[in-house]
Every structure is written in C-alpha cells, then in structure tokens.
Amino acid sequence: MGFNEKENSLEYWDNIHSKYERNEIKLDDWLDKFETIIDSCSTPILDLGCGSGNDTLYLINKNKQVISCDQSSNAINNIKKNFPEVYDTKCFNMLDGMPFDNNSFELIIADLCLHYFKEKDTFELLNEIRRILTVGGRLIFRVNSVNDVNHGAGQGNEIEHHLYETSDKRLKRFFDEKDIKFFFKGFDIEYLNEEIMTRYKLEKRLYRVCVKKK
C-alpha cells in the first residue's frame, strides 16, 4: 500500500471514529461460536482493528484481558476513555509490522480489518500475525464476501483479483472460499462459513473464520 493510500485510509477511519460513548457501542454475538476457545484463554487477547470497541466490550464482559489496537488515534483515545479497565492499547498501522514479540498471543481477534490490502501486503500481514501467535494459537476473524454487493463488492476499479479501489481512493478486498484458503494456507482452517449480518442498516455478507497456527 502506497503512502497516499495509507494516508487516505487513516483519514477515513479517524473521521469514522471521531467520538462515541460506551453506551453507544453495540454488542455483536459473532464470537459466541468460539466461546470455548475464548473462555479457555488465560493470557491477554489481541483485538486488531478494534475500531469503536465492539469486540473489546464483548471480551471485557467475559473478564478477559484485552489489548485493543487500531491505526486511528481517535479510536484508541475513545477506547481508553470508554474502557478504563482495558488491559492495554496500541496505535499502529498493521502494514508497519506488529509491535509485539514472537509467540506473544494464544488468541487474536481481527473483525473486518484484514480486507483492505494488496496481495503482497496481506501475506506480509498474515506472516506477522503468525509470528506473534504461539504454536497452536488461533486467529478468529471476519472478512468481506464477494457477495457483499451492498458494501462495494464488484464496485470501483479492480486493481487485483477481488481487490477494488473505492471512490475515495481506499482499497477494499472481497473474499470467496478459494481466496481464504489461498491467503490462509499457512494456517490450519478450523472454521469457515459465509454469513449474513446487518451493517449500517443494510444486509452485509461476510465470512466468519477461525484458523490455527501450525
């Protein structure tokens, strides 16, 4: 991702996360499917691309230690304000690498934050995730589906297979099952399912996935 693309992305998300209160954050039950995995995790859980803190709130409600991360300083400032009990926060762009030691986490959550990158950058990002996961550690995530027509699938300039440049010059990738198996071939895929949710009052199609470090 070039400099301008990174700047455009950061400006977009800083605007999205300008200000919100804890009572405005809505819980999403998508992680319930992995309750056993989450409940058995006794070490801090990494929440990548935490945004407004939906998953951070879910994990805190389960008495988990959470490290909430986002590239937007606005998002991180809101997390600190709304969740003073959060274990830790980090503000960084994932394309610059993960500021964590090898084998630091047994569980990483990445909700709708892994589908904004070119193929080369996606593989580098996943290599970083694999580096900081323990052997047998898991990454639980959701990504856009190629069927997500209400949220941009097939729209804009296709610069790579299933990767589009939006009208505001951001990148947005849409996955099918074959794409997920291609990008996550360095992991064992334990769960993979295309699902429907409501986002911004419109139907959204996405994949819910759990992979394990080999």
What are these model-derived regions, one by one?
Residues 99-101, 118, 176:
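GHKL-family ATP-binding catalytic core of two-component histidine kinases
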Residues 106-120:
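A short SAM/SAH-binding and catalytic strip from SAM-dependent methyltransferases
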Residues 98-108:
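A short acidic, Gly/Pro-enriched loop at the edge of an enzyme's catalytic core
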Residues 123-135:
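A short glycine-rich, Lys/Arg-flanked "PGG" loop and its adjoining helix->strand segment in the class I
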Residues 73, 119-123:
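Non-membrane alpha-helical structural segments and their capping/turn regions in soluble enzymes
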Residues 48:
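Conserved beta-strand/loop positions that form the S-adenosyl-L-methionine
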Residues 1-42, 51-87, 91-97, 140-213:
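Class I (Rossmann-like) S-adenosyl-L-methionine-dependent methyltransferase catalytic domain
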